[in-house]
Amino acid sequence: MLTAKYVDLAIQSAKEAFPQWSSLAVPKRAEIMFRYRTLLEQNMDAIARLITLENGKTLEEARGDIRRGFEVVEFACGISQLYKGESLAQVAQNIDGQTIREPLGVCVGISPYNFPAMVPMWMFPLAIACGNTFVLKPSEKVPLTAIRLAELFQEAGLPDGMFNIVHGGKEVVDALCSHPDVAAISFVGSSHVAKHVYTL
């Protein structure tokens, strides 16, 4: 299990990678997402078997797990359209309104053991497609699926530092949630842990 020191290294890696990634043209980020989608599709059965191995789901349940996450990646492939801002002329006399979407920075995801592919993939594909960098803390009970998802993303061309994984329990969660360089946290888990995360 990792300690707060290693959490800090992962966050620093994401922080250092953020300026390069966030300034990359949105269509270029979409290209990487499309390549990632293709690799996921090609490796879907292998990932399902990995989920079965480490989580104990039936192969059919595991396929459903990865399929639901895959749908989010497909959605993120449309980031060029999704990321567009809005403008409205003459909101008031001689005043125009404009909305611009900008990445936040280092984002964190904390996910449970029962959906080792689906829940993390609710979080990181869209965050990364939007120009953020990401640190994922999967459940320590199912570490392998997250690692494989990250490996495929790197194969798709995601540069180093954009997607980091840390493993551990409460100490790691505490370090992630209290780190001053974390801009946003996404959490799925028990109500008890959610209350703890919220108080940090």
Residue ranges, per PLM feature:
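Long amphipathic alpha-helix in the N-terminal Rossmann-like dinucleotide-binding domain
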Residues: 12, 34-44, 59-83
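Short, structured beta/alpha segment
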Residues: 1-49, 53
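A general structural signal for well-ordered alpha-helical segments in protein cores
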Residues: 11, 33, 69-70, 146, ...
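Short phosphate-engaging motifs
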Residues: 6, 43, 47, 69, ...
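Residue-level signal for inorganic ion chemistry
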Residues: 14, 29, 51, 73, ...
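Rossmann-like NAD(P) dinucleotide-binding subdomain of oxidoreductase/dehydrogenase enzymes
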Residues: 85-200
